Amino acid sequence: MFLKFCVVAFAICLSINLSEGAPSSETIYKFAIIADLDRKSISQKNDNNYKSIVKIGQLNQVGRKFNFAMENKDHEIFTKYAYKGRGAELSEFLVYKWKLYTFDDKSGIVFKLKNNADLVPWVILANGNGDQVDGFKAEWATTKGDKMYVGSTGISWSDSTGKLNSNSLWIKEINQDGKVLSSNWKEYYDKMKSAMNMPKGFIWHEAVNWSKKKNQWVLLPRKCSELPFDTETEETIGCNKIIIASENFQKINSIDIKGTPFDPAAGFSSFKFLPDSDDQILIALKTIEKNGKTATYLTVIDITGKVLMSDKIVNKDKFEGIVLLKSTEGFLKRKE
């Protein structure tokens, strides 16, 4: 009996030791990023063609550790639609009603990106209140309920004549039929500035998502400062904070992201919640435009501000949208 007990005890101890020593299983996430090439979007082969680039990557997770790899291939996508000689400056990636969309921040066009790499115009967003001749500077997009929400930077600025431009304070609600409702978010943007103790400063938004699981807004600002917006200095300013807000922005929390960013001038351009993380873990793009040069970084953080993967360089071009893909099979495969 004693011998049997020893054998069982040894087996249990061995099992425990093997479990503790065994490597955690790996989880793989496929994702794609899309570029805003600014003036480089004009095709060198055809002045009437404008291009963007989509790249595919893979994020690997083992426990709370992350790393990633990017495919070498550039998937070029083209459109002839432009505004004042600028086009395909695509600033976000979003799945809505099982289709993939992207947003031109010059023309205001919402494009559907098909698997064969065609960019198909779906909706044109007019600037500001929706009754203007120029396009909306779309910078972020998310889904909430049955609607797509599209927003801009959330800042006001004065032009060379001193006239105040507040078009970026508006957001667009779009239903599945393409009907657009324009809403002024000045009150919400001002509340966020107050919550961050920046009432006279500015917060530049490009990365906003609605969390269905937590019933709250999550925002990762691109830039933030206690000082008023200044075009002479904004290139040197980033932001290393998370904003969490209730549905109607009655309750707002500002969270510092722990650690030091690779470059203080880099700020968030897009993020998505990782599946099965209960909207607790975020994969995010950070971009920088400084002294005529650009770069894109990838990072992983949690909702408390803990950095799970520090900023890592992705590309020297500026990629402003990220989307998670269930599969990349057949993705952006042009028909021969």
UniProtKB/Swiss-Prot annotation:
Salivary gland (at protein level). Its main location: secreted. Residues 1-21 form the signal peptide. One of its GO terms (biological process) is proteoglycan biosynthetic process. One of its GO terms (cellular component) is extracellular region. Its EC number is 3.6.1.5. Glycans are attached at residue 209. It is found in: Secreted. Belongs to the apyrase family. This is Apyrase. It comes from Phlebotomus duboscqi. The lineage of its organism: Eukaryota, Metazoa, Ecdysozoa, Arthropoda, Hexapoda. The gene is APY.
